[in-house]
Amino acid sequence: MSTINQLVRNPRKKKVIKSGVPALDSCPQKRGVCTRVYTTTPKKPNSALRKIARVRLTNANEVTTYIGGEGHNLQEHSVILIRGGRVKDLPGVRYHTVRGALDTTGVDGRMQGRSKYGTKKSKK
């Protein structure tokens, strides 16, 4: 335990909590424009072609965002909405694209977990 003299000379430091999604500026989502849409490969031991986009946000930050689901319609200059949430096997990807919002279409033919992929309920 520290003495009072020690605490007067050197007070206790507050823990600094670092945000996992700094580019969002404490907002739930942010809008941005795609500057590049491409695929990349994940870290070992996984193997795939993950779809990602480089996005310039409304606060002038440039981030890399993951495009989830099967198939997408994004290209350069598409306006998209991003949310937080990293992709564990893609280094540097800390954001997800919100499907079904702005220029991004939902996933076609999706029956389960539709709300996460912006898909409307299908008519029987």
UniProtKB/Swiss-Prot annotation:
<keyword id="KW-0699">rRNA-binding</keyword>
<comment type="function">
    <text>With S4 and S5 plays an important role in translational accuracy.</text>
</comment>
<protein>
    <recommendedName>
        <fullName>Small ribosomal subunit protein uS12</fullName>
    </recommendedName>
</protein>
<comment type="subunit">
    <text>Part of the 30S ribosomal subunit. Contacts proteins S8 and S17. May interact with IF1 in the 30S initiation complex.</text>
</comment>
<dbReference type="InterPro" id="IPR012340">
    <property type="entry name" value="NA-bd_OB-fold"/>
</dbReference>
<dbReference type="GO" id="GO:0006412">
    <property type="term" value="P:translation"/>
</dbReference>
<dbReference type="InterPro" id="IPR006032">
    <property type="entry name" value="Ribosomal_uS12"/>
</dbReference>
<keyword id="KW-0820">tRNA-binding</keyword>
<keyword id="KW-0694">RNA-binding</keyword>
<comment type="function">
    <text>Interacts with and stabilizes bases of the 16S rRNA that are involved in tRNA selection in the A site and with the mRNA backbone. Located at the interface of the 30S and 50S subunits, it traverses the body of the 30S subunit contacting proteins on the other side and probably holding the rRNA structure together. The combined cluster of proteins S8, S12 and S17 appears to hold together the shoulder and platform of the 30S subunit.</text>
</comment>
<dbReference type="GO" id="GO:0000049">
    <property type="term" value="F:tRNA binding"/>
</dbReference>
<dbReference type="Pfam" id="PF00164">
    <property type="entry name" value="Ribosom_S12_S23"/>
</dbReference>
<keyword id="KW-0689">Ribosomal protein</keyword>
<keyword id="KW-0488">Methylation</keyword>
<dbReference type="InterPro" id="IPR005679">
    <property type="entry name" value="Ribosomal_uS12_bac"/>
</dbReference>
<dbReference type="GO" id="GO:0015935">
    <property type="term" value="C:small ribosomal subunit"/>
</dbReference>
<keyword id="KW-0687">Ribonucleoprotein</keyword>
<dbReference type="GO" id="GO:0003735">
    <property type="term" value="F:structural constituent of ribosome"/>
</dbReference>
<comment type="similarity">
    <text>Belongs to the universal ribosomal protein uS12 family.</text>
</comment>
<feature type="modified residue" description="3-methylthioaspartic acid">
    <location>
        <position position="89"/>
    </location>
</feature>
<dbReference type="GO" id="GO:0019843">
    <property type="term" value="F:rRNA binding"/>
</dbReference>
